[in-house]
Each structure stands twice: as C-alpha cells, then as structure tokens.
Regions:
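Short beta-strand to alpha-helix junction loop
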Residues: 116-117
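PLP-dependent class I/II
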Residues: 2-18, 24-61, 72-104, 130-426
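Glycine-rich loop-to-alpha-helix module at the N-terminal edge of alpha/beta enzyme cores
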Residues: 83, 106-111, 124-127
Length: 426
C-alpha cells in the first residue's frame, strides 16, 4: 500500500478493514496491543514470525562502534579520550557557521531542495574541482548532491549494480561499503593492501602499503562491474574520467560531519543514474546546509582555509605521534588525512585478562582496543573491522587513531598512553 505524504500512518491503518469493517490493529502496534483476532492470527503464524528482520540486517555480528561504546561506558577510567572515531573535536570555520545560520532565515532554504542539489552548491563544487580535473565541469550534468558521501556511495551502487554483478574493494575498507554493495545484490571481491614487511619494527610512510597487482588482475573477470578506490587519486586521462565517479564530503572538508552533505562528480551518462537512485532513496538532501556548504566552498580559497587545514592537520599528526616515538611504537606515517595506524605488536596483553566473550572471540586488535579503554582510558579503533576474516591477520597488531581533536585532547591522550610502558616488551 502506498502512503502519500498527506496520509498519516494511523489514517492508513484505519482504512485497512477486516471483512467486518473493523480495524485489525489497535492504535498501538506492539503485539500485546493487538485485538483478539490479530492475536489469534499471530498464534497461527508463529512459525513464520511476522516481525522477523530481513536477511540483509539479521544475523550480523556486533559492530565495532557499539563494542567501543560498550567498553567506554564500562571503563573504570573516566572520561574516555575518544581517539577512535573520525569526528572533529572543533567547529567548522566561522564563515561556514555564519552561512548555516543565515540559510535558516531564507524561506527557500527551509523547503525541499531540487533532487539533484541546490544549484549554488553544484556550481561551487564545479568551480572548486575543475582545476583538479583539468576540465570545466558542468554543474547541471556532472555534479549531483547526496545526503553525505555514504548515501552517495549507496546511490552509485544502486544506480549500476544488478544481482550477480561483482564489485572489487580494497582492504582496509569502510564497513558501510559492504551493506551498500550487497543491498542491490552485488557480490564483493576483496583485494588487500599489504603493509611493509618490517612494519612491526620501523615507522614507515603509509605509501609503503602496497597492492599486489597480479592478485588484482586475477580478481577482475567478466562479472566485474565496479572497482572502489578509497584513496585520493588524480584523473590521468579523459578516457578514465568517462568511466569514473568521484565521491566527496563537504562535512569532512569543513569539519562538519553532522551536516551530511555529500556529492558526486562524473560524466553525465553516469551521474544521471546516480541522481535517479538518490531521488528514490531519500528524494532530496538537507537544504539549508547545502546552502552553507556552497558558501563554504566559495569562500574557502579566499580565507586561506585549504592551506590552513593542511598545515594544522599535519601539526596535529606530528604532535600526537610523538607518543609513539617516545614509546618506540612503529606507525604508518600518513601523507594526508587525520588517521594513523600504530603497530602495537610490542604491547603484551596479560594472558588472564577478563575479556568478554564477544571480544575474546575477535582478532587481537579488538582485545587491544578493549584493553586500552579499560586500562588507560583511550579509545582507538581495531582495523580488522575493515578486513575480511581471511585477511584480518594483516592488521591484527594495529590500532587506528584519529587526530582531528583539540590539542589539549591530544595531550591528554598522549599522557594516558604513557601508561602502556609497563606492558611493552621490545
């Protein structure tokens, strides 16, 4: 039954009559509020639970985010310093905040935006990215706006993946990619990145993680529909542009992850299907924050924001990684972004440590994560969450830290991590 936007759920239920022209369900929908006939029907269908979840969401093991939150709530060390999740510990630039406030006063910004996004934002993105692509982007046909980069990825997969199509992703991957690909019926093929062989004993550039291209070539086959590259890359030729979708996030760019403003750039013959899928998933995206993001893109260069952002993030990375140098813990030194992987193989966990069963059954990095939260009060993310079980061994000695926090938070985290000294065996 289709419910139009003017039809409330309660009205729709009231219109659904039994043969006796009486509502089958009372106003409340939980089982104990069903009327006697509904309860009888429920009893006869007990073998086929009418409230059973779909397979795409059922039977999933506990995700890393809820495990970290559980550990943080139970830790005797409070408050926890959250260095795990990649949210910013500070506000967007003032020109972006001011633009968001001003947008709320505009009538048109408080109503539905065009399904493909507000024209001002699409123009601002086209202007910002045209130099990088080496061509003048058409904002009407080569840019579309989505509700965050994650929904943009889902729209791209929904727009092109049919059941049985294969998508290649590299490990480590963002865990949302899995459900985004599987929902339209795609099959995932995995190719891992390999750390340097001496990564447990030497701090090395993150660029030394490498792809086995022979392994990649063997994975490509006639069913391969897409390859996902979760890394900054340059478009090297016009031919590559014609078959590439680039996904971006205004929230990540301007320290505003809660805004959920994403975008895709690509040729018209690809973008139109992504936009079509987006329209059917959520119709349109948040209008006032699109306007704010447009102003932010327009003013970023003039305000020197991009250069300042790169400089400040590099300083934060260097500041935080001082603790790893001090503890002689090797790490993958990133050349961009705000995540760092530290190799914790020298941290020896007590053999009798009381890990809960759902942590004890997971790879070593989950135990390291739980241990850090409970013993020193610092939260990190176990990167095997971003690997298949077959390749989890590659990352089980690492932990991921996010440095996009205020400097005082970084200093507190460093001081607490010094508590690991007594557990380190070189």
């Amino acid at each position: 039954m289709f419910l139009g936007h003017r039809t409330s759920i309660s009205t729709a239920i009231a219109r659904f009559k039994t043969p006796a022209q009486q509502p089958l369900f009372s106003r409340h929908t939980s089982p104990r509020f069903l009327d006697p006939r509904a309860r009888a029907m429920s009893a006869t269908t007990s073998r086929a639970d009418p409230f059973r979840p779909a397979k795409r969401v059922a039977g999933q093991r506990q995700d890393v985010w809820s495990i970290v939150n559980e550990a943080a709530a139970a830790s005797p060390v409070q408050p926890i310093v959250n260095m795990g999740q990649g949210f910013f510990g500070y506000n967007p630039p003032q020109f972006a905040i001011d633009a968001a406030k001003e947008a709320l006063d505009k009538v048109e910004c408080n109503q539905y935006s065009p399904t493909k996004g507000r024209p001002r934002l699409k123009q601002a993105i086209a202007d910002a990215y045209s130099p990088s692509f080496g061509r003048k982007l058409n904002p009407d046909t080569e840019v579309t706006i989505t509700t965050g980069a994650n929904e943009g990825m889902l729209s791209a997969f929904m727009g092109f993946i049919e059941p049985g199509d294969e998508v290649i992703i590299f490990e480590p991957f963002f865990d949302q990619y899995i459900s985004n690909i599987e929902m339209p019926g795609g099959t995932i093929r995995y190719v891992p990145l390999h750390p340097p062989k001496d990564g447990a004993t030497r701090t090395s550039p993150a660029s030394e993680w490498s792809i086995d291209f022979e392994e990649l070539e063997k994975t490509i086959n006639p069913k391969t529909r897409m390859i996902v590259l979760n890394s900054p890359i340059a478009t090297l030729s016009p031919e590559l542009y014609e078959r590439t979708l680039t996904v971006g996030s205004a929230g990540k760019a301007f320290y505003a992850t809660g805004w959920r403003v994403g975008y895709l750039i690509g040729p018209e013959h690809l973008i139109k299907y992504v936009a079509g899928a987006h329209t059917r998933i959520c119709y349109s995206s948040v209008s006032p924050l699109q306007e704010a993001a447009a102003v932010a893109f327009e003013q970023a260069d003039k305000a020197g924001f991009w250069d300042e952002s790169r400089t400040e993030m590099k300083k934060k990375m260097e500041r935080f990684c001082e603790i790893f140098d001090e503890l002689n813990i090797p790490y993958s030194d990133p050349e961009g972004g705000y995540f760092v992987l530290a190799n914790m193989s020298s941290v020896k966990l007590p053999e009798d440590y009381p890990f809960p069963p759902h942590v004890a059954s997971r790879p070593r990095d989950f135990k390291l994560c739980w241990f850090l939260i409970h013993e020193v009060g610092v939260a990190a993310i176990p990167p095997t969450e971003f690997y298949t079980d077959a390749n989890a061994h590659i990352a089980e000695d690492y932990l991921r830290f996010a440095v996009c926090k205020n400097d005082d938070v970084l200093e507190t985290a460093k001081e607490r991590l010094r508590g690991l000294k007594k557990y380190i065996v070189q």
